Amino acid sequence: MLFTEILGQEHIKAHLTQSVNNGRIAHAQLFVGPEGCGTLPMAIAYAQYLLCKNTENENTGGNESCNLKFNNLSHPDLHFAFPVAANGVIKSHPVSSHFLVEWRELIEEQPYGNLFDWYKKIGIEKKQGQIGVDEAQDIVKSLSLKSYEGGYKVMIIWMAEKINTQAANKLLKLIEEPPNKTVFVLITEDEEQIINTIKSRCQVLHFPPLSEEIIKQGLINKYSIAEDVAGKIAHQANGNFNKACDLVYQDTEDTQFEEWFIFWIRSAFKARGNKNAIHDLISWSEDIAKTGRETQKQFLQFCLNFFRQALLMNYNASELVFMEPKSENFQLEKFAPFVHGNNIIEISDELQDAIYHIERNGNSKIILTDLSIKLTRLLHKKAS
């Protein structure tokens, strides 16, 4: 993968290439950035620059046969680990090596893809993937071997926040004192979920969200769409190129999430003193509970963002509002006055608590019903 194929992040490209040119390569690095900012493509381009001894701050000019191997991510000294779970084909002890064909397809099709895209790709969208102890054993085994081409070995661990405790304990010593010429690149969207004993052993690089202009140019170059359309999509994407690509194809799950959200909000408004609306909320909770836990977490995160957007609209920060509801009968401007300083913190806390409990395998129907009843009270709270 060429550095020129990666949108923006020029200061990070310069830092990484200079560190290789100067021979100052940290053995463990943590790339931290929000979805769609390019952490994974950057890690792959960095690995190529390092393994192929490229020059001129680009992935050319070095070992051409090595560069060719990176075209289909088949270099023997490039290793990947990522969250997995058992599916219809792999029934037990799933590890990343079982899913490399699908992984390469995902990077070819959606290098800026998110965790949910990956779960859908391997058919585990109703499960929660993890990087477990079997994966840790595979990592230890693969990195104990000598490098195939006599140079560096690179281990890219994508979504490192999904490393469970047992795997983290097994990897700790290896990350602290890796074999000679071994580089770990851990990638995360949530730095706080990385255990401190691992984070403290890594050099941390923070990736900012992409600017609207960079996303706009990326969309024009990739899809040849009109500049004004690309500009509108870039604004809605809020720094996330993966979301921008989904919006081009109208392939975003946000459309379904918006329908669920609007029904939920309307039922919550009606539920005060209306028994029938309470039944609607319970039925809604049952329907959402039938989806996978990853879908539920994605949806609740969408709700969190929707409430924040409404708050910004209510306090006249319209330039920061990027959401545009597709429903003809729902207007953000009319909903915004019900989200204010007197209830937003409680709403946010309740949503984050629900995400926490769902992630830890709580009963989704009970969690969502409880959240719905609390939302009914909070939406009727008066602004102070």
Where are these regions (language model features)?
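Charged, glycine-rich active-site and insertion segments that engage polyanionic ligands
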Residues: 1-69, 180-183, 189-302, 306-384
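Clamp-loader machinery-focused feature within the broader ASCE/P-loop NTPase space
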Residues: 2-162, 166
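Conserved catalytic/switch belt of AAA+ P-loop NTPases
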Residues: 144, 169-183
